[in-house]
Amino acid sequence: MKILVTGAKGFVGKNLCAALNNIKDGKDKTRPSLVIDEVYEYDLDSTLVELDSWCKDCDFVFNLAGVNRPKDNSEFMKGNFGFASTLLDTLKKYKNTCPVMLSSSQQASLTGRFGNSEYGRSKKAGEDLFLDYQSKTGAKVLVYRFPNLFGKWCRPNYNSAVATFCNNIANDLPIQVNDPSVELELLYIDDLVAEMLDALEEKEHHCEFEGLEVVAGPLGKYCYCPITHKATLGEIVDLIHQFAEQPKTLLIPEIPNGSFAKKLYSTYLSYLPKEKAIFDLKMNVDQRGSFTELVHTLNCGQVSINISKPGITKGQHWHNTKWEQFIVVSGHGLIQLRKEGTDEVLNYEVSGDKIQSVIMLPGYTHNIINLSETEDLVTVMYCNEVFDSSKPDTFFDPVEKD
């Protein structure tokens, strides 16, 4: 399959082309039914000769080219309708009736706040042109009215509030929110790309529109991405501020799989300047070694790393409800446990040469001993709760009694 992508250097185009090329080059094997031979990437620096050749040769077209923020409103029609005419005329020239996807916008509904949108009018004109092309040629046309888009590589201070918020907060720049209660419908770039790949496999999702509302149905003349999220401007900004504090608090917010928060967090991180991609952690250092907290979570505890100097014993305490897992990743050590009120000592010899996890059982006093005379003992420690100095649940008691 040979695929033509117009607007290939735009936000959607870059992400889609990356996905298509990963499949073409065998780096992405999750869609075995897709065999991609060529990805033709058309943009402003391409020539009409190239467009002509690619329109003759292609098996599928993603038309993402368009104008979002022109200097003059008249450029909307030229950029969003004019190029579409050129594209379709070139396909007709070669009698190439391959499927064509059109990137449109919710604003093409021309309803509500979009009633007087010049951008919306140009997009609606493009839709009508493509649908007319479909009726006259029999070519399959997929018209997608996208809501607000967000994700990596989206240009800030252009036409995405999320991109602007992420960029500005990541770079310590001011943001402006006039009404935090305004709700947006948001489509994540990976979900959009997944739908485009579905379309290549003839698994696109069809619908009609009642105003801005999607009415799903297999006979709908439009198409849509089934996974979107709704959030207010205030909620979006609050989440991004939480993400920005993570290097200080170590707290990873709840980001369930598929959630808006997870997608927004990844988006925010893509705007971090290089100096913020590295940050210091607080090492608690003494003559025995060091203890450093790495990550805190809201409901699943924390992860730390412990370094013990040669011959050092750490621990010698027990917990009621708290429990831990010790994973030695470097060095040679001994982990000991003893159930409170008993004399039997459990001994677990551990080494970075064989990674194992030892559970510090509730009600068992425990320690960890560096058996080496020359090397540090490095241990990753998981605890089921974040340490709370007001409720430490930690009680001193040596494992081995004198």
PLM region spans:
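Conserved beta-loop-beta element that borders a ligand/cofactor-binding pocket
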Residues: D128-W153, L173-V182
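Conserved Rossmann-fold NAD(P)-dependent oxidoreductase catalytic core, especially the SDR/UDP-sugar
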Residues: S85-E127, Q134-T137, L142
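Mid/C-terminal beta-alpha module of Rossmann-like enzyme folds, strongest
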Residues: D198, E202-K282
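A short glycine-rich, His/Asp/Glu-containing loop-to-beta-strand
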Residues: E275-Q316
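N-terminal Rossmann NAD(P)H-binding glycine-rich loop of SDR-like oxidoreductase domains
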Residues: M1-G26
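NAD(P)H-binding glycine-rich loop region in Rossmannoid oxidoreductase-like domains
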Residues: D43-T86, T90-Y94, Q107-F114
